[in-house]
Design a protein with these regions (language model features):
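Sequence signature of WD/YWTD-type beta-propeller architectures
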Residues: 1-347
Length: 347
């Protein structure tokens, strides 16, 4: 491991993080909705009772408390043009994919105090994730024969080949300790599938699909999946929940995307639902930015299907969304400008 990313992997800012905490809080839109950042972030993670996030323009890592106050820069490594991140379970490390001139790079970075250490990972990795419960990473490598899945330590030592697959366009995930997921890249013009590989049983099974526009997001405990499909008859998305143990599908009867939802693992799911959706091919139009939305934040009970409109998010098109571990907040990114927001639940 090196102090900072490889020189070819990022530009080192020799100035040290000042460690001074900004006294201003996040911008309060109302008593419960808070704008954590005014600038774009390239990913965020929950950290104790606060947040860690990466500033998109510089690649600097910051942390704050739960309402965006006391922001502190904790990284002195500059990596611009970050477009995808995955964090470890305690937000002490991250996998960071970024552009460097004409190349795509992937770095594994460990944040230690006010410094960072990192290594470049192989250039042929097409998808990656962190283990939910231990210090291991998983990644998918494209080969001439298809795809190979590897697990390794974050510095890419102690590699282990997990699985080989025929050629496909999969996004890999690690939703539970013994489960690895493989999801087709979603498009309303192609049928997608979701598979799960059970590490203990060495079994590879289909969970969902084939379905047009299939997008999926696992519950926090990996016991269920929220998923959206493209309904060609209405030219809009539809949202469902699937319970793996019971093999039961629940139609939430709302029009939104799996990427806009969070399931902490109980009876309630939380979804950002657009006020209106123009008929078209989804999620393609949304993912490419040709269509954007103004969302409301809803809570939906998956047993009773009772719905509660929690907030008008005004000009926010929710992209990434996560519940805090203490259940007091939900955080999300605005796809329109990349800013980070938080919503405080009622006590």
């Amino acid at each position: 491991m090196l102090d900072g990313i490889f020189p070819s992997a990022g530009r080192r800012d020799n100035s040290q993080p000042d460690g001074d905490k900004e006294k201003d809080e996040g911008i309060k839109i109302d008593q419960r909705l808070v704008q954590i950042t005014q600038t774009a972030v390239s990913g965020f993670a929950l950290k104790n009772e606060g947040l860690r996030f990466i500033e998109r323009s510089t690649g600097h890592v910051f942390e704050s408390d739960s309402i965006g106050a006391n922001k502190t820069r904790i990284s002195n490594t500059t990596i611009p043009q970050i477009f995808k991140t995955a964090w470890d379970s305690d937000a002490e490390g991250a996998l960071i994919m970024y552009r460097e001139e004409e190349n795509i790079r992937l770095a594994s970075v460990l944040f230690k105090g006010t410094s960072s250490e990192g290594v470049l990972l192989p250039a042929d990795i097409i998808s990656f994730d962190y283990a939910p419960d231990r210090d291991r990473i998983i990644y998918l490598v494209k080969t001439s024969a298809g795809l190979t899945t590897f697990a390794a330590n974050p510095d890419n030592t102690k590699q282990a080949e997990i699985l080989r697959l025929p050629p496909a366009d999969f996004m890999i995930g690690w939703p539970a300790a013994n489960s690895i997921s493989f999801l087709s890249r979603p498009s309303g013009e192609a049928e997608g599938v979701l598979y799960r590989f059970d590490i203990n049983k060495n079994s590879f099974d289909k969970v969902l699909g084939p379905a047009l526009g299939l997008g999926a997001k696992w519950s926090s405990n990996g016991a269920g999946v929220m998923y959206s499909i493209y309904d060609r008859s209405i030219k809009k998305p539809r949202m469902f929940v699937y319970n793996l143990k019971e093999g039961k599908t629940i139609d939430l009867n709302v029009q939104t995307f799996a990427q806009k939802c969070s399931w902490p693992g109980g009876e309630d799911v939380f979804c950002a639902i657009p006020t209106s959706i123009t008929a078209g091919i989804y999620p393609d139009l949304w993912l490419t930015g040709e269509e954007s939305f103004n969302d409301h934040l809803w809570k939906i009970n998956i047993s009773t299907l009772q719905k509660k409109d929690l907030a008008d998010l005004q000009d926010i098109d929710v992209n990434e969304i996560k519940n805090s571990g203490d259940g007091k907040f939900i955080y999300f990114q605005n796809k329109k400008d990349g800013s980070l927001w938080g919503f405080r639940f009622e006590e």
